[in-house]
Amino acid sequence: MRIVEDEREEKLAKSVVLRSYWNQNDMLNLQEYLDKWSDIDLEDIRKRMQKSEFIEILSPNLKMVWNPEKLESNFTQEGDILWLKTPQSWVHWIMPDGFKLEQTHPSLLQLAVDLLLRPWHEEVKAPLDEGREKGVNYALSYSAGNDSSAAMQLMPEDTILGYHERNFNSNLNHDNAHRMINHLRKNREVLTVESNHEHLRRLRGKPTGFSTDYAASVHLVLLADFLDLRGIAFGTPIDNTWLAKGLNFRDFSKSKHLQFWRDRFAEAGLELIHPINMISEAGAMKICKESSFIDFMNSCMRGNGVKGCGKCWKCFHKNGPLGRQYDVKSREIYSFLKKRPLRSGMHAIWATKVMNIKHLLPDYESILDSDLGWWEQYYPPGLELIPSELREHVENKLKQYLKPMNTPYVMETINLYLE
């Protein structure tokens, strides 16, 4: 898009363009150019977009029918926008300059469709096309929160950080993430890709969110050839690896989940990496507390860009132990503390202990009265899950922050269903 060259009139021209998109209800272009032209002060439009509950499912200037036989054929590209035709709607991503659909291996497109539609469509489970060779770079599916920031600290410094940004209106607020990302960008690049793919669950009567455990990385899967990726890392802590939902121990190394998704990513020439599988959310906090970015990092997704909302579960168990404000009487926090099995399991128990409010969990008194120092240490067997090329680097970084758990491992005895 060409904007007038006269610097005195440039802001006025940009303002006219943005207000035109608003008046035409062209939310996709409006969001794209609001981001590109951050120097334009249109807070009224920005705030109205955030508060609106209306989700417009956009579509390209092309008529297509879902093809279940050739999944990669359901993609098309218009400028920087990559489109995917699904059986129910269109999904889009605003891709970086230079991305070209035709230069993307079919297996990556097929894997992306699988990650988005697996819960509802059997045809996406077919074998992927062969032939994609591994690249040389690593990427991290980055959320700007506690766990993925700890993963960032353990991965090599040249790891590509890829942030997925939901670009339709919901109760999620990106302000806290933006603050962290803007801070990081002073020293390294952070790639942000906007998409509406989280609406797919909503079409099926479920809360807005990710279709599968690894759908948060779809933007990086689609960009794997563009970025020459060897593997994609996730900030998944012990709470969701060696402990199932933070409640009971399992041998994650032999789990069907890990074996299946490792193989599935490998079909597309990608390594699936869990750099913090061996540490808890508490361990991740300890790593982040020793970083220069701790004052900019906030896991709350409803905050105002400076602090958390103080009323959500993330503010309780992620911000509370950092000494940040939370309201234990808020509806969400109060109800989750009463729910059984306990949400966030071991980490919630640890959090109540370090915040000196263990009276809120009287039925876990025996655990609360025990030594929970091991929860802030790392589980050595988890290092074996790190790809060999990365293992030494991750282990050396890890030892700078945390001590190993002692044997016999207390964690291997955890089963909160029995409490």
Region roles according to the model:
Residues 12-26, 32, 37, 46-72, ...:
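Nucleotide-activated chemistry modules centered on ATP-dependent adenylation/adenylyltransferase
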Residues 74-80, 94-96:
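ATP-binding N-lobe of GHMP and related small-molecule kinases
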Residues 91-117:
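N-terminal cap/recognition module
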Residues 143:
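Metallo-beta-lactamase
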